[in-house]
């Protein structure tokens, strides 16, 4: 999405998107979930969800929104937020900034909002960066990869399991490719080179035989990385 300016807070953005993907219910946002006694673990206070308005959109419409936003991550501008094995939806944003009533050239707020699992959302992450330096200013290239990193950590913390049925990522020519490192320990230098040269990665070493390797076999690396 490309727009002129940003007129909502991050919390307002998350609240609105949450209503669009949860079946159409607008909830009052809150920061604190519960207060727990440090030593005993006893719950002193717990905040319950408060409905502001129900049926803002129908469940069918909400499902279509989720499906569409999932395709943004697998097929569209949000591919940098894709995580293998997880159904993720999201939307990129690029908003031109205003100064003294005039839209500024080359000065943007770039953002990405992502959620997972796309078919039954449990987590929403929104990130906006004001005028990033030294990089192409698009939400899909700047903000989406950071949201991906946050969601990867959240997946572990929340115990969200992988699931089947999502849309596989469609790679474009400008996407970086990932490879699984082959096991070349025990091979000669010539044998190892013949295997590694089939991938767009760097490799280096000394001697005539491979006695160790880094990263270890089975690791995932991005094109251009070095195997030693």
Predicted regions and their residues:
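Active-site beta-strand/loop architecture of penicillin-binding DD-peptidases
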Residues: 1-52, 69-159
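A conserved catalytic-loop motif detector
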Residues: 55-61
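Ligand-recognition elements built from short beta-strands and adjacent flexible loops
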Residues: 85, 99, 127-228
């Amino acid at each position: 999405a490309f727009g002129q300016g940003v007129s909502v807070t991050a919390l307002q953005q998350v609240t609105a998107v949450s209503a669009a993907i949860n079946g159409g219910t607008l909830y009052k946002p809150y920061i604190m979930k519960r207060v727990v006694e440090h030593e005993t673990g006893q719950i002193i206070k717990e905040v319950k969800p408060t409905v502001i308005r129900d049926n803002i959109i129908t469940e069918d419409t909400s499902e279509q929104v989720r499906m569409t936003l999932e395709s943004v991550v697998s097929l569209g501008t949000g591919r940098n937020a894709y995580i293998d094995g997880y159904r993720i939806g999201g939307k990129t944003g690029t908003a031109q900034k205003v100064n003294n009533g005039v839209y500024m050239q080359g000065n943007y707020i770039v953002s990405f909002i992502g959620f997972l699992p796309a078919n039954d959302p449990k987590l929403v992450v929104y990130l906006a960066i004001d005028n990033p330096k030294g990089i192409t200013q698009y939400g899909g290239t700047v903000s989406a990869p950071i949201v991906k990193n946050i969601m990867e950590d959240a997946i572990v913390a929340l115990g969200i399991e992988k699931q089947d049925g999502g849309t596989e990522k469609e790679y474009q020519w400008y996407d970086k490719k990932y490879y699984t490192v082959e096991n070349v320990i025990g091979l000669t230098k010539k044998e190892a080179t013949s295997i590694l040269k089939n991938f767009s990665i760097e490799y280096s070493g000394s001697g005539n035989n491979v006695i160790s390797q880094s990263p270890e076999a089975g690791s995932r690396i991005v094109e251009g990385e070095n195997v030693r």
